[in-house]
Curated annotation (Swiss-Prot):
InterPro entries: DNA_glyclase/AP_lyase_DNA-bd, DNA_glyclase_Znf_dom_DNA_BS, Formamido-pyr_DNA_Glyclase, FPG_cat, MutM-like_N-ter, Ribosomal_uS13-like_H2TH, Znf_DNA_glyclase/AP_lyase, Znf_FPG/IleRS. Monomer. This is Formamidopyrimidine-DNA glycosylase. Keywords: DNA damage, DNA repair, DNA-binding, Glycosidase, Hydrolase, Lyase, Metal-binding, Multifunctional enzyme, Zinc, Zinc-finger. It comes from Prochlorococcus marinus (strain NATL2A). One of its GO terms (molecular function) is damaged DNA binding. It comes from the Bacteria.
Length: 282
């Protein structure tokens, strides 16, 4: 599943390449891709005849502003890529591939195509008269952004002080911190030198400070590399993310730790495959 760095990479691409994209026509090939009330018919009526304006990211959600030709607000287009969703910009209309779910066409004949192999990705139209969390309920439950002032060791200490679950489980919970998934939870815990099985409430203040610093560091490095591609992720221009080759532990089970030489372990923690070094992470 695309995590914060991959979604941020897509956000940057959407903002860079679509600043003059006026949606003239929409085709919805898979009804379940549209999650807002009224289904695809209402979605098409609401979103077409709009400019795609600026793009923001909240956790793993993409939020695009919709504007009239006079640059008045028409609300927002909200997208969650889920497991395998990706956007592709085509300079001219070509035959839809098997996993194409939604197609947006502009006045110049360009196509913004949403492709989703697993078909879990979703889109919402949020009218300007409503708040985004009213329509997209998942956004209500998100914790602070890792790069925000609200995310710090004091916040984590207070939030986790009664949590008996593992710190790996806590990091994957979007209510703890928004946008972190399996890849960057593993990489962060390695960088911070923390055992992923350790109970959240038992982490010391010094460990929580390291955890915050490591998360921001790892995410920034991955964003700079365009995210991680292990299977389906591509940016808007079809380019793979490059962070995977730099991974310290993720998908390196059985290989030697790059720091100490110990074998990297892989085991299930909170139902997720977890990669870690038993020597470096205490």
């Amino acid at each position: 599943m695309p995590e914060l760095p991959e979604v941020e990479t897509v956000r940057k691409g959407l903002e860079k390449l679509l600043n003059d994209f006026y949606i003239e026509r929409i085709e919805v090939l898979k009804e379940r891709s549209i999650a807002s009330n009224g289904g695809s018919k209402s979605f098409i009526v609401s979103v077409k005849n709009s400019y795609l304006g600026s793009w923001e990211r909240r956790g793993k959600y993409l939020i695009g502003s919709l504007l009239t030709k006079e640059k008045f607000s028409k609300g927002f287009l909200v997208v969650h890529l889920r497991m395998t969703g990706q956007f592709k910009l085509l300079e001219k209309e070509v035959l839809a591939c098997k996993h194409t779910r939604v197609r947006f066409f502009d006045e110049r004949g360009r196509e913004l195509r949403f492709i989703d192999i697993r078909n879990f990705g979703q889109m919402w139209h949020v009218p300007s008269s409503r708040s985004i969390p009213e329509i997209v309920s998942g956004i209500k439950r998100l914790g602070p952004e890792p790069f925000s002032d609200d995310f710090n060791s004091h916040y984590l200490e207070e939030y986790l002080k009664k949590k008996t679950r593992s710190i790996k489980s806590a990091l994957l919970d979007q209510e703890t911190v928004a946008g972190v998934g399996n890849i960057y939870a593993d990489e962060t815990l390695f960088d911070a030198g923390i055992n992923p099985k350790k109970e959240s409430r038992n982490l010391k203040s010094t460990e929580l400070k390291r955890l915050c610093n490591s998360l921001v560091k790892i995410l920034n490095i991955s964003i700079g590399e365009g995210g991680t591609t292990f299977s389906d992720f591509r940016d808007l221009e079809g380019i793979n993310g490059n962070y995977g080759g730099q991974a310290w532990v993720y998908r390196r089970s059985g290989k030697n730790c790059k720091k100490c030489g110990e074998k990297i372990l892989r085991e299930k923690i909170c139902g997720r495959s977890t990669h870690w070094c038993p020597n470096c992470q205490k």
